[in-house]
Structures are given as C-alpha cells and as structure tokens.
C-alpha cells in the first residue's frame, strides 16, 4: 500500500465510526418482540450488522409475503431513541481533525439509509465529513462497489487515492471490487491491505503526526 497516494479516507459507520452493537440489537429485538419472535442470535446479529434494512427484514421475516406491517411498525418505532446507545469510537474526533489538517477528504460509505443523518446530527459530526453515501444513494449497496465509486466520481479520486476502513466481509468485497485500499478494522479475519485496531492506528498508518 502506497500511503503517499492516499487523498481520502472513507469509513464504514457501524462497527467503525461507532460501536452500534447495543443500539442495533435493541432496535431489532424490539422489532422481533413485537411480532412474537425471539431475540437475535449471535449469528443473526453478525449478518444483520452487514445487511441493508431490506436485506435484514427479508432475512428475519422470510415467512412474510408482504413487509407492509413490519415497515409500518418500524416507522412508528423510529430509530431516534436508539441512537443514544451508539458510542463513537475512541479517538475518532482527533483522527478526523488530523485528517482535515493534513488535507485528506473524510467520507462515509454505509449501508444505513435514512438514519445516517440523525446519527451524525445527534453526535454533532455533521460538518466533519466531506461526503456521506448511504445505501439509499446508490443502486447497489455494499458488497457492491457503488458507494465507493460514487465518492470517487464526485470528488474526482482514483481508486489508489482511497483508503476504505471497514469491519465486515461486505466492506472487504466492496473495496476489492472498487479497487481501493482496504484497512480492516478490529477484524483480523478479513483480507486487507492492512489491519488496524484503533483510530490511532489509522493516524499512525498515514503518518499524520509527522505532518504537524
């Protein structure tokens, strides 16, 4: 990996920018409970963590011909009350400030849809990213490369100028298809150009402190 070519750092949201395990488990368990289903198993949660909302619902409610009642309850329930249980990754704000100071574009590529704006607003991070792309902004969400390709096209970057930081197989596949560099976050099982375990590791990788 040639770090000198990197001009932008793109982050996945869940499991990278934020520890969302508690919030997402509570959200989906509330949904499942309403329809008389048991709480998520660990394997179900692992998969739902990667999925778009539509994929998650198709997976959790395979017996339903229509998801109308599920979507109606989700609309009434909302996600806003669960955002408070999302914890920003330690060192995130410092890394984002260092990236900006050193001239890097900061972006998000996430399979979240209409909840992403609220997440950033509540955590006062709306102005900290140059571009945010969700599953709702592209035809094909991750593991397809569309989110990364949209960022590259809009900001005029080539694949070798992008470092994508993700924690799931979907992130890995998206990076491979888009041709970008890939940093696996807290997941040593992924195939990646590098593995990092903290926001500080990303700063060290890009040698940000040397630019002070």
What positions do the PLM features span?
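Ser/Thr-centric signal marking residues that sit
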Residues: 16, 20, 110, 180
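Asp-based, Mg2+/Mn2+-dependent phosphohydrolase catalytic module
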Residues: 1-8, 97-100, 113, 118-212
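A generic alpha-helix signature
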Residues: 23, 69, 110-111, 142, ...
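N-terminal helical cap/lid subdomain that shapes the substrate entry/recognition surface
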Residues: 2-94, 98-102, 126
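Residue-level marker of regulatory loop/turn positions in helix-turn-helix DNA-binding domains and
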Residues: 88, 109, 140
């Amino acid at each position: 990996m040639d770090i000198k070519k990197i001009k932008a750092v793109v982050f996945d949201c869940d499991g990278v920018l934020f520890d969302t395990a508690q919030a997402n488990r509570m959200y989906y368990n509330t949904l499942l409970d309403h329809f008389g289903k048991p709480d998520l198993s660990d394997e179900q949660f692992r998969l739902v963590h990667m999925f778009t909302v539509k994929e998650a619902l198709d997976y959790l409610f395979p017996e339903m011909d229509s998801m109308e009642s599920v979507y109606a309850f989700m609309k009434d329930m909302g996600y806003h009350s669960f955002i408070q249980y999302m914890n920003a990754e330690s060192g995130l704000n410092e890394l984002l400030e260092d990236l900006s100071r050193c001239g890097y574009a900061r972006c998000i590529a996430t399979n979240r849809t209409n909840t992403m704006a609220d997440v950033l607003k509540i955590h006062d991070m709306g102005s900290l990213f140059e571009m945010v792309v969700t599953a709702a902004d592209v035809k094909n969400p991750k593991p397809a490369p569309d989110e990364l390709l949209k960022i590259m096209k809009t900001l005029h970057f080539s694949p070798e100028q992008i470092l994508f930081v993700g924690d799931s197989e979907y992130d890995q596949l998206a990076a491979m298809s888009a041709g970008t560099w890939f940093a696996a976050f807290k997941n040593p099982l992924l195939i990646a150009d590098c593995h990092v375990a903290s926001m500080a590791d990303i700063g060290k990788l890009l040698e940000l402190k040397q630019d002070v």
